[in-house]
Amino acid sequence: MRRDRDVTAAEVDLIMTRCDELATISSHPDYLERVHLSPEHRAAHDLVEGWMQGAGMSTWMDAAGNRVGRIEGGSPGLPALLLGSHTDTVPDAGRYDGMLGVLLAIAVAGRFRPGELPFALEVVAFSDEEGTRFGTALMGSRALAGTWDDDWWRLTDADGITLFEAFQDFGLDPARLPGAFRRPEQLVGYLEAHIEQGPYLQDADRRLGLVTSIAGARRFALTFTGHAGHAGGTPFDRRRDALVGASEFVIAVEAASKNHGTIGTVGKLEVFPGGVNVIPGRVEFSLDLRAEHDVIRDATWAELEAVAVDICRRRGLTFGTREIYRADAVACDPFLAEAIASGIRSTGDVDPVPLWSRAGHDGMAIAAVTPIAMLFIRCLDGISHHPDESVQPADVAAALDAFEAAVRAVAATLPVG
């Protein structure tokens, strides 16, 4: 279906304005940060709910704090094709990661009448994808997929509030969480539009990309422990400097990642006791490790563990590790991926660019309960998780039309009713 350009332009203007509006809802006055089960979470979802209703959807908040909108299909109660993304952010975030996908989904839903499709159409604004507050990602989508881990209830935020307590403070009942779970027979599939968060579409001079798979990721909390001492009085041959050991390990992360074709990042590091004239006795730091294939990711980790053992042997240190997150790689469903590809082709791009997603997405969790596929949208210089995150309205327009066409491609294979 070819859309009137003026109509699409007006829809895109509205999407961009709404991204700006959501970006004003932040827990910090100087930058964008919006986390799970916070007042800002509620305020953002109240806005999203109004926009869903304006697009003709019935709405509710599920038992995990996700906001859901639904348009019925040819008859009430049909299985639903889910469209969605997330509304939470990292600290000092951009305004398009997650939010653009939610707003595109709402706009697409607004292009359909109740009863028009052979399935219901639902838009889900996931409450927690980033894991910023409690350190574990994909909580919103894991709840919907029925893969919730009850050990999470004991997780705490920076203020010592447990996830269990935060649920209650938000007005949710932890005992009712299973009410968010979906069954496979209730769903047709899941489609997500998202900024690429990488430079590959820009390098290829393409607006849109076809996601083939989502990287498998593991995250670790790591510790090197040595012995603190006087910076002036302790000779080098007697030092057990935890920071020097950790620094050597960080360099090894870069080297091993390049060697294996994985992506390893140390994004957080704390030094103790932290005195300017004290040899560091302990270093606590993070490791984010991801790859297109789990076997490659795991081989990289095995190599890094061996590196850590060698560092400890040479420097008189001990190494501690705790895995805090694991998500295996997920392949996009061939049928739904072809629907996305046909949507891209409908915009004039006859040979869609296939890309594997280096970033994690809610689809990783949703794949446990229903097939998934994703559409990538070019972002300026591949920048994401940063205030400079940027998209072009023309690319958003192409994404909107392609996403609608993908829904219609799925519908074309099913009878109405």
What are these regions (language model features)?
Residues 2-38, 127, 383-385:
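N-terminal capping segment at the start of a domain
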Residues 9, 23-24, 162-212, 250-255, ...:
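Active-site-adjacent substrate-binding region
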Residues 15-21, 84-85, 281, 352-402:
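Zn-dependent metallopeptidase/amidohydrolase metal-coordination segment
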Residues 27-72:
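A non-catalytic alpha/beta surface segment that caps or lines the substrate-entry region
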Residues 33-37, 267-275, 286-293, 318-337:
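A short beta-alpha structural unit
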Residues 83-85, 92-130, 218-224, 230-256, ...:
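Alpha-helical metal-binding/catalytic segments enriched in His/Glu/Asp
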Residues 128-129, 133-295:
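Midchain, well-structured core segments that form catalytic/ion-binding scaffolds
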Residues 214, 230, 234-259, 306, ...:
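His/Asp/Glu-rich mid-to-C-terminal helical/loop segments that flank catalytic regions of hydrolases
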